[in-house]
Amino acid sequence: MKKQHNYTVMHWGTWQVESREGEIVAVKPVPWDKSPSRIGQSLPDAVTSQTRIRRPAVRAGYLQHGPASREGRGKEPFVEVSWEVALDLLARELRSVKARCGNEAIYGGSYGWASAGRFHHAQSQLHRFLKGFGGYTASTNTYSSAAGERILPHILGPLSPLHRQHTHFSELARECQLFVAIGGLPLRNAQVNGGGANDHMLQYWLDKMQANGTRFINISPVRNDLSAVPDAEWLAIRPGTDTALLLALSYVLIAESLYDQAFVASHTVGFAPYRAYLLGEHDGVAKTPAWAAAITGLDAQRIADLAREMARHRTMVNISWSIQRARQGEQAYWATVALTALLGQLGTPGGGLGFGYACTNLAGAVRKAFSGPRLPAGENAVDSVIPVARLSDMLLHPGETYEFDGQQRRYPDIRLVYWAGGNAFHHHQDLNRLCEAWRRPETVVVHEQYWTAQAKFSDIVLPATTSLEREDIGSGGHDGFMIAMSAQIPPVGEARDDYAIFCDLADRLGFGEAFSEGRDAGQWLRHLYEESRPRAQEEGIALPSFDDFWQQGVLEYSAPERPQIFLADFRADPERYPLSTPSGKIELFSATVAGFGYRECPGHPWWDEQEAARQRQEAARWPLHLLSSQPRARLHSQYDHGSVSRATKVQGREPLWMHPSDAQARDIREGSVVKVYNDRGAILAGVHLSEQILPGVVQMSTGAWYDPLDPKEERSLDKHGNPNVLTEDRGSSRLGQGCSAQSCWVEIAPWREELPPITAFDPPRFIEV
């Protein structure tokens, strides 16, 4: 198709691109974006950098000895080969694994954000391909919010649709008097949205709310988690103790008869056992503000006063995704649901509940929505599915059973891992354990654009194009925009689109026609767009023809006439508009969850003193609580090699924020490099000192590319600063089996040796055979 414009879409924004002679010269945010992300400025220098994968490559030992050489994974040089050699080798291994072990032995979960374009979305292409090949072991849920994703259907409803149904910011600006932000409202998180962020609106709406008199309270160990509201009250809570605070707030509402008795009676079930627990009738411990103060570090009187303020004002309570990425993270979400049910403001304009305002650019900003262009994936003939955060457990313990959300399941025996569009060496916890697990399969294949750690730890590496080198359609589906994405530069080196790679593989494996349906990439774009037009029409959106869309470049849908209010219909008539829970109501006590028999997840929200004691023991050994947050200069690990992310480094290392008192006790100074360590590993980091963080707590961003000092050495020092070297690879609970990265304790010491050079962004060594 003829290029008509210069738009491209990334998860963090829509950009106008200037290119010259095969290079990206400049990118400019589109004029309608209120607060553009700066991440896009990494594109010009990153796309054609030395980090780019330019030819297919095979690990030397694998090329010579096949799967028998798996111990060399991540340690050996690579051999660049032709596409014919690489695809023939991969097709042979796929056939072999299928014939010997069945399709269950292929893991294609391939978690990651990939690209914003809807057709060239790498996971969608991979899953369609593997389903056509007979199926694969898949993954379920996310690293971001798995604990919430599993508890909420039992007590309120599925998280994903709830996220899209949040009360619109315009209603909050009109009606909300008090906004309680548990975990803050970080602007850095709201830079992104799956499928593209076209208009960054968080700061705009928070300014509107402040101007209209909304008062904000930031409940977080980190003050700048609500930096968008400088006057917000900061309640510096100890990490991991939010559940205790929420229980105490509910206690005050009940003890002082401040809760909405009529709403509780008509819209909830299970009040009596929950009330009994809060009042201490079960365990002899009333969940009073004084009880919570000893756990959280907050003032008991302030806790009691906060409960009263919430009852007196139109209050929105928002809990961030970060809170549930912890041991028993399900409990904080359940306790938040219970608290807001007691307040009785669910479904009111400006009041109620949020599970992710500021977690992406979506919550509270949904405009006219429809299911946009999407590649049909087909049916998976294999029913093997694991919780995504149990990746290492699956690879290390094939055949073992585990418990998950009321079921007993079995880990499959994975022989081949196929990844496209993600980076397990960013997402996963305890990277030294992952290194061990990653060497268990016979073959690891990756489609990648850059020489990330995951690419360096693979056997067959296939170079893929970036969004700037292919045509696509950008559509988040809910933000009111659709963008025609033109190819801005030719493919770098020998890079191919994922679709072209899979077409060639499918031809070799005998299902090429079924996979491609006889269409090239341009024909697929036209087909998927035209197929989406009737769905848009059902939502009152009239899409032009594909040719007109491509000529125009940008489509913008109108905003809804009536702003969305979360659970308004349920509030008005719970019988006519029941929830999807077993009772159709909010479940303060869940017979379903109680029936699972999990000690750590009884039938109502609770504080697990046994787990708290275990964590105190860890803190006695490792006195600093490490929080790993989303980065502001990249999306997860995407474009860590770009100029924007690299400019944030301290002596080349990922920054670590700590309180001056903690630094002084360890003879650590601003801008110095330190060793951060625990019994799982050690990393280097560069220090920033700040009084905006609670003493005893340190914070790093995730996504620094893993860079072991000596890849041949087990548990080697990561010289770049990836906090997931230090985090524990343990499920949040048997119910959620989510990531528990925020439950992490470390010690820090000055680094007094010579600084090793950063090699994270260097290609591996290549040899000829």
Tell me what each language-model feature is:
Residues 249, 270-397:
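Active-site phosphate/pyrophosphate-binding segments
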Residues 210-218, 222-312:
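Long, well-ordered, tryptophan-enriched scaffold segments
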Residues 3-4, 9, 442-443, 449-450, ...:
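Phosphate/diphosphate-binding loops
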Residues 230-237, 465-468, 480-492, 643:
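Short beta-alpha connecting loops at secondary-structure transitions
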Residues 122-207, 212-219, 243-244, 340-456, ...:
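Extended redox/cofactor-interaction regions of prokaryotic respiratory oxidoreductases
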Residues 1-258, 708-769:
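N-terminal export/assembly segments and adjacent metallocofactor-ligating motifs
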Residues 498-552, 637, 641-657, 661-769:
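Long, contiguous, secondary-structure-rich segments that constitute the structural scaffold
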